Amino acid sequence: MSEGFSSSSIQELYQSLKEITNNADVELFEDRITKLDFESTDEPKHANDIIKDRFLRPSNALPWSLLDMVQDVPHTSSPEDCSGKLDYKELLKVPDPINRTSYQFKRTGLEGKISGYKEEVDLKEVANANASNSLSITRSINHNQNSVRGSTAQLPFTPGGIPMKSVKTDSEQNGSSTMANATKLLHKDGQGLFDIPEGMNRGIKPMDSPAENEDQNGQFKELKQLNEIDNELDIRIEANEAKLKEEEKSAKSISEEIMEEATEETTADNADDAEIDELLPIGIDFGRTKPVSKSVPVKKEWAHVVDLNHKIENFDELIPNPARSWPFELDTFQKEAVYHLEQGDSVFVAAHTSAGKTVVAEYAIAMAHRNMTKTIYTSPIKALSNQKFRDFKETFDDVNIGLITGDVQINPDANCLIMTTEILRSMLYRGADLIRDVEFVIFDEVHYVNDQDRGVVWEEVIIMLPQHVKFILLSATVPNTYEFANWIGRTKQKNIYVISTPKRPVPLEINIWAKKELIPVINQNSEFLEANFRKHKEILNGESAKGAPSKTDNGRGGSTARGGRGGSNTRDGRGGRGNSTRGGANRGGSRGAGAIGSNKRKFFTQDGPSKKTWPEIVNYLRKRELLPMVVFVFSKKRCEEYADWLEGINFCNNKEKSQIHMFIEKSITRLKKEDRDLPQILKTRSLLERGIAVHHGGLLPIVKELIEILFSKGFIKVLFATETFAMGLNLPTRTVIFSSIRKHDGNGLRELTPGEFTQMAGRAGRRGLDSTGTVIVMAYNSPLSIATFKEVTMGVPTRLQSQFRLTYNMILNLLRIEALRVEEMIKYSFSENAKETLQPEHEKQIKVLQEELQTIEYKSCEICDNDIEKFLELMLAYKEATVNLMQEMVKSPSILHILKEGRLVAFRDPNDCLKLGFVFKVSLKDAVCVIMTFTKPYKLPNGEPNHLIYFPKADGYRRRNFPKFQKTDFYMEEVPVTAIEVITKRKFAAPLGKVIKKDVAALNEFNAETNNILDGKTLKEAINIEKQGLKIHQILLDRTNIRDEIFKLKSIKCPNLSQHIVPKFKAHVIKKKIEELYHLMSDQNLSLLPDYEKRLAVLKDTEFIDQNHNVLLKGRVACEINSGYELVLTELILDNFLGSFEPEEIVALLSVFVYEGKTREEEPPIVTPRLAKGKQRIEEIYKKMLCVFNTHQIPLTQDEAEFLDRKRFAMMNVVYEWARGLSFKEIMEMSPEAEGTVVRVITWLDEICREVKTASIIIGNSTLHMKMSRAQELIKRDIVFAASLYL
């Protein structure tokens, strides 16, 4: 720039600047920093260098004049001046705090001019961010041993979408959102700076310098002037130019030339800007300053329903390079899902079973492989995880598939990891480094969020997942997919695309089986055939009529009818007497749910099949090629029983028998020889070789898997299964049969829900093999109820409902990590979705009310102004006392004596207008009163209600403020008792009923009485203090005191008080509404907050946390216990209770926490005295914890409440002998449970042993650690821990 000037012009500029500086008459440079102190020189080159140094070359060092302003020079004194005294204050230095904020410039325009500054919280400045001090996704990676499972010593990653207190979230570090969320809870001053530190009531209060004290703030002025030095220089040059113009009018000064050149440059720049603006799009707004108004947040819809009523013709153009392709054309809903995944969105796919939801999951897995990221596939149960592992291994050749369960880790570094939701929850709380690489989380069978025990885990996982993770939710059809997706979207601040299809790939045809006849009732177009339904009733009623005529439309012996005589199992059709039931199945049904028994007056049983029923229907379906079939039976015992009834029926030829035999032999080679001959395996083998099988929770895991694999290969033609078979297992069949549409759910018999029926019926119909799926509902001896049948088969599926509840493990984990508060977890749960969705609407209402508050005008009055605020306060207190009085009066029997028919009362209508009327009737139950009103609403001349209290005895006050009520024709009005303001002693003697009937004499008396009242005579209250109970007496006393205080005020004598109080009262009402809205938006309105506070009190009392909610040693141990009963187990561990037992005794005692127990059978005696002593100690500790729970009124789950009554110690002997080395066959001889239950209990015990072992490390108990390791070794053997056939 300087090279554009000649040497002579530079010399002239130099001389001109010297003259400006040295001229005493022109005081342009007032501050010492910017004063131009030039040395005298005549050399042009030297002058050029000085100007360059001064203006063009920025210095790396600050001038001393500026440094003196921002630094303190320590006071130094000579030894002679010390006088032997030391200044100890010099030693009391407060160390500099860690500064987690930084100042950022606000820039505007394309040039990036600085327009202001802002202060932001920034964790990137924290040195050495790691898993123990940072929630950032960019923190340093921890040890490899914790990369998969994480550790309780680690913090989780920042949950996505949730504004964190004083924490900069990962999304903000990536620049995808503003700091408003992260710092909205910190207070800022007028300049936008944080002035009150978190946790303190007050902070820095800088002194604002008034205008008259500008000289005292010169240093701050100099800093400000330093930032504006360029502008000041321009101003001074302009001033100098004006002076030179006066002296040399004919010649131009150097300064003027400079200014002209600068103006020319500016004009050229503006011309360039205009050319650039022509090239830029009109709507461009980056880098431009825009006026920002503090608008009310608009309610944003995060869920977007995708329209499927179209075909995507250009799918190949939209997805030119798909991550995966299929040999068949995708359905529209699958294409939409794939498209949105490629766009980086999250999707919620709701479709029927076998509709092809798995395609979406497969595409996400392939996409993650292509992007070199990971996918996590979560399933509701471990068995489904194993099956999905096998399916995906067969589906993908190029993608690594891994499995993580409680006891197995296969290929944990794979691109796709399959696990249960509980495992993922644990990984999130423990900050597993593996989460960094996850791009997709697939939630399969989302409708299991309705599960009462495990639904809360799904919500926790969704809330805790980091921002970068995308969601793929797969579910059966549910009515509120949009609501659920909108909750996830709002919580995670992500758009969720809802793709819901009611279409079935294979339509269903629902039939009823009645007396060897298959009757279609609902066709494949979902049309109900009522004539056919009546036909099934006629068939069954016709058979029943041999014994007794039918009297009900629903048929005899149904769920709500008396049992009819006659059945299918006896020769004479009358049923047998003297058997276990009198009637029962043989007698045509039951009374209600059962029949009259021979020994007891009422014995309930179900209308069920005979031994011929299943052979008949199997042969019928076999002839019509409707096999294979699955029969859903809601009892393990009946599954086995019904399979036994098919003895003699064989579905397999010799070749199939040979293949089944070879597969079984190959599968059980992993078992010990003695385990291969277990009764259950031998029986299952004999059934399988005939093409028949059973599937329920009592089977050994290896037997269940063996049956599932053979069924998928088509070897099993008839399968009797419980409803767990329908839980996600991809095993379609030709026909599904319901042995009943009622089941026992643990509490009692009930009908199946439409969702349960749809889930099980959806197994019917194999895509590509069957044109329709056949569903059969069994009707044995009694016809089905049409209403029940329609509701179950065609009803609306169960809505997704939150099962969110607080657990101690969750509370302690959140208190441990401190970043996410428990209140926030509750706030963002699905249970609070409705309230949170209304928050933008509440904020909008608050803004409207605040604006309305600003428009209220207050009139000045010499009488009122001094104490009208006090009057309003006392008036509101008096009104509140009156409401409390009436609430208590309703509970008191005296109300009936006071509020008798004809009693004159003054009451308020919904608009707060006063009216007079006679009591006609009172309902104490509903706390309402019917009043015969005879006055118009009392209003002020301007139409506003008169809010003042109606004091009937104060004549002067009453005449000023309630001069005259206007009479009207009487009418009846129902008002709450609390709306009554005054109950007078006056009573209308004649019956009001006659007045209503327009009796002339009664009407005349009524008119005379009302005219007398309206003449303004003094009225007295009917409630006497002396005759009331203690509580009412106290309220009346308080109210009288308030009244006396009111009449001491000066404003009570104001003639216009009723008008002057209106704006004050209106402002009070608006403020109250605003407070209510703020309360609705606050954490104090959370429905689970009282429960949280009670549980906090429990944790404090039991010393899991301290008074400041810091997690203590007990709490850290409880964080490790995820299997339930964490408080009791922690007490056992820290009490060193387990340390005094041997490993085999420890696992036996711990079995009480995994075995659910039974209530009917008695517990077997404990085998050793030591175990008996351990049992007694566990009961003592549990009773102690129950006392604490009861003290704080903690709501308990059914399992927690019945822990001591369900005989949970019944498995103790079995586990003890297993740990001692007995074979599985031997322990089954003493087991009260089936083989599958025993295996499940021992498997869960291994998980508890692992958790206790980790807890022992925390407390430093090496002996317990060794014992728990030994205990795991003792139980992990043989058939219980045999490898899965899917792995």
UniProtKB/Swiss-Prot annotation:
ATP binds at residues 351-358. Residues 540-608 are annotated as: Disordered. It comes from the Eukaryota. Residues 338-496 form the Helicase ATP-binding domain. One of its GO terms (biological process) is nuclear-transcribed mRNA catabolic process, 3'-5' exonucleolytic nonsense-mediated decay. Coiled coil: none annotated. It is an enzyme of class 3 (hydrolase). GO terms for cellular component: cytoplasm; Ski complex. Its EC number is 3.6.4.13. A motif (DEVH box) lies at residues 444-447. It is found in: Cytoplasm. Keywords: Antiviral defense, ATP-binding, Cytoplasm, DNA-binding, Helicase, Hydrolase, Nucleotide-binding, Phosphoprotein, RNA-binding, Translation regulation. Residues 555-567, 585-595 have a biased composition (Gly residues). One of its GO terms (molecular function) is mRNA binding. The modification Phosphoserine is found at residue 209. InterPro entries: DEAD/DEAH_box_helicase_dom (IPR011545), Helicase_ATP-bd (IPR014001), Helicase_C-like (IPR001650), MTR4-like_stalk (IPR048392), P-loop_NTPase (IPR027417), RNA-DNA_Helicase (IPR050699), SKI2-like (IPR016438), Ski2/MTR4_C (IPR012961). It catalyses: ATP + H2O = ADP + phosphate + H(+). Residues 638-815 form the Helicase C-terminal domain. SMART domains: DEXDc, DSHCT, HELICc. Residues 556-577 are annotated as: RNA-binding RGG-box. Component of the SKI complex composed of at least SKI2, SKI3 and SKI8. The SKI complex interacts with SKI7, which makes the link between the SKI complex and the exosome in order to perform mRNA degradation. Present with 5770 molecules/cell in log phase SD medium. RNA helicase component of the SKI complex involved in 3'-mRNA degradation pathway. Represses dsRNA virus propagation by specifically blocking translation of viral mRNAs, perhaps recognizing the absence of CAP or poly(A). Essential for cell growth only in the presence of M1 replicon. Belongs to the helicase family. SKI2 subfamily. This is Antiviral helicase SKI2. It comes from Saccharomyces cerevisiae (strain ATCC 204508 / S288c).
